[in-house]
UniProtKB/Swiss-Prot annotation:
BP GO annotations: DNA repair; DNA replication
Domain BRCT, residue spans: 593-671
Cofactor(s) of this protein: Mg(2+); Mn(2+)
Catalytic activity: NAD(+) + (deoxyribonucleotide)n-3'-hydroxyl + 5'-phospho-(deoxyribonucleotide)m = (deoxyribonucleotide)n+m + AMP + beta-nicotinamide D-nucleotide
Catalytic activity, EC: 6.5.1.2
Gene3D superfamilies hit by this protein: 5' to 3' exonuclease, C-terminal subdomain, 6.20.10.30, BRCT domain, DNA ligase/mRNA capping enzyme, Helix hairpin bin, Nucleic acid-binding proteins
Organism name: Escherichia coli O9:H4 (strain HS)
Name the record gives this protein: DNA ligase
Amino acid sequence: MESIEQQLTELRTTLRHHEYLYHVMDAPEIPDAEYDRLMRELRELETKHPELITPDSPTQRVGAAPLAAFSQIRHEVPMLSLDNVFDEESFLAFNKRVQDRLKSNEKVTWCCELKLDGLAVSILYENGVLVSAATRGDGTTGEDITSNVRTIRAIPLKLHGENIPARLEVRGEVFLPQAGFEKINEDARRTGGKVFANPRNAAAGSLRQLDPRITAKRPLTFFCYGVGVLEGGELPDTHLGRLLQFKQWGLPVSDRVTLCESAEEVLAFYHKVEEDRPTLGFDIDGVVIKVNSLAQQEQLGFVARAPRWAVAFKFPAQEQMTFVRDVEFQVGRTGAITPVARLEPVHVAGVLVSNATLHNADEIERLGLRIGDKVVIRRAGDVIPQVVNVVLSERPEDTREVVFPTHCPVCGSDVERVEGEAVARCTGGLICGAQRKESLKHFVSRRAMDVDGMGDKIIDQLVEKEYVHTPADLFKLTAGKLTGLERMGPKSAQNVVNALEKAKETTFARFLYALGIREVGEATAAGLAAYFGTLEALEAASIEELQKVPDVGIVVASHVHNFFAEESNRNVISELLAEGVHWPAPIVINAEEIDSPFAGKTVVLTGSLSQMSRDDAKARLVELGAKVAGSVSKKTDLVIAGEAAGSKLAKAQELGIEVIDEAEMLRLLGS
């Protein structure tokens, strides 16, 4: 049996190894939750055996050494980390410790914030001008990232307003919105560049570039959450007051900062944020809870590496480790072959996960994945679980190579990969049962034809029994035929028939989207419908004419043109119309006759809106003569940026396109 000294040595060595991978290499091998567990184990052992604590133990410092490639900045006020709690019981124990330690009977008010999952930085302003910026580093010394931070548009180069201190060091988090992260990885996959495991790694990798021009191209943003150095000026005597003051001076502060009067209110805040987490547009891994009063903060003081007056209340881990038992290949509605890892089931963020996407052959090669490997699985919000990385240091001896199929696993047709594309596809078309199933599921989906009650299992049975081959066949179904399906009684069957009848009345945009043309999403379908007005005009359009539509380039135009050039597709459309599918005649909106600031403009919406849904905003803009596109290009006239706007906002700024916020949009809509 190992001695206590040996256990401590092994834990410290393991933690230092993972700190190096995380802080220096930007290539973490294990999830945060596993690191936290190891750190807790070490801290518990050291608490029981304080005589064995060493000065270089990971519990005695904040992080790891800075990268040698950057010059170093010594923090005048150390950048400490926070202690963590992981459940309500631990938070309530922290709350009690704070109450017990305060000598007075003053009420404690809590300032609660989001715990952003990015990179902690300090930014020094002298007489209101940004003069330097640094990473946390080891808490005492960080990396000089001034040139890179100056490229982040959310961070003001000069503060504005009155009573700005002579020297003010603000602290906060640089992070990457989800949309920006997806765009970076999409571009990387297309060009063979580095694909990041998660937005935090992408933010760190973007900020720690030796070439600031690369950082400038990444849609990084920033929220301020604290202060370090303060000279030649005063700040409010509460934490919230300071954040509001920073906001007045032009520093970005999260609008989710909330003052809580009791532990019960803090817990309610925690659960509300946890509920809202999937819709924020950026990654968080918990909430930060701070004593609001600066006087009480001073009274509570610090321990070696963290303040006694604050704690991070972390959410259940979104990353966990497990083993890949097999890799299978699924076929999508456009024939795309997607490898899926079959996993040893593991709970991730409160959900039992047994499958994870591997995207494509390039991703398997990038990961270096073999069947039998130990891997890190990530699940964020509604995102499909994915394999983040392989734990190479724990690779079993009996792993097997993943062999990508040369023939479709469903219909046996050849698999081809077009040059320049990452995705391999089955060439079987609608003779492939898998493609037929997925096409029909898309056709009846809520955002397409919206056939209520026709779920995936019904479609699977209809295809397997060969009752349905094309979307038009759906409208020929009878209650009698449906009653023969598994778990389908006469009443349920009649409900489905009624839903199909109701779905015949649709819109031109929904109909186009339901057809499942490659690269034609909802926004593009709406743009095509608005521009051409009728099916006949769209079918007759040339590739050149199609490219006049906002959001349509040569690739999309070619897909649309080729779809309508295919006789079998035209036949299906004719059958659908013969079965009674219809939509209202187009209402021609002449932008020149509309007195509106949006008339005739191509507008792009990005980020989340708080006062109306995206669909309502789009409809209102179209009524006022705007063309609403799904992506930013040189054709775009205006971008409306909501909360947590990502890569579209960054591209608009890069192209010099006018940008307004939601408040200005609402003002113009009402004018």
